[in-house]
Amino acid sequence: IFSMGLVCAAAGRLLISKKQAESNDKNAMISGCAQEAADIVAGITVRELVPLVKADKSLVSDPIKATNAMVCSLDLSAGEKSFVKYGIRGVRGEAEDGFPSVINHALPRLHSDLLRGMSWNDAMIDALLVLYLIVDDTTVLNRGGSDGLAYIRAQAAAALSRGGMRLIEGRDFVQSLDADFSQRGLSPGGCADLLAVTVFLEMLSNKWTTQQKANGSAQCSS
């Protein structure tokens, strides 16, 4: 909800501001939307996460023990726990940075697969694997710790090295991951949220450029 709501707000703000109103450049639209999102949440880590780990150091003789106690005693979200325990900013940091995992990695893979004629389902799986490989997923960290995150990354790398959904070997390997992750209790919810953002931006940018071209044709004909 956070990521999608933010990107929708960013897209709306971009449209109203008309910063990209005259452009049918798909990449410019996507980067503009990401920048708007970053502007909306600028400073969110400092506002929401940093206060969680501020404490009177004179009262903390064992920082690690104190941190673990804080994580256990407070009603924190998975993202908040990960920041307190590992210093990972999670989705807040991703948004603050303009969704680089989406813009620079998942979206190019999704777009490339679609251009190859692959189905949306297969292209989305490949994009998800790319996200598994690079995202510090706080849901995984909360449930499986750093070992769980490392395992998911290793399996994603193995799947992509086999071609992902582009090749039979990769497809077979991906099929086995479903049961494997379920058995281990690993559910990369953060990556799933970023996949939704990836798909949204791909669809929105296609719609945007199509509409801009149509508007341009209408103006020429008139």
Regions found by a protein language model. Name each.
Residues 2-179, 183, 202-222:
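Phosphate-rich cofactor/ligand-interacting catalytic cores and adjacent structured alpha/beta frameworks
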Residues 199:
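Active-site proximal loops enriched in glycine and acidic residues that flank catalytic Cys/His/Asp
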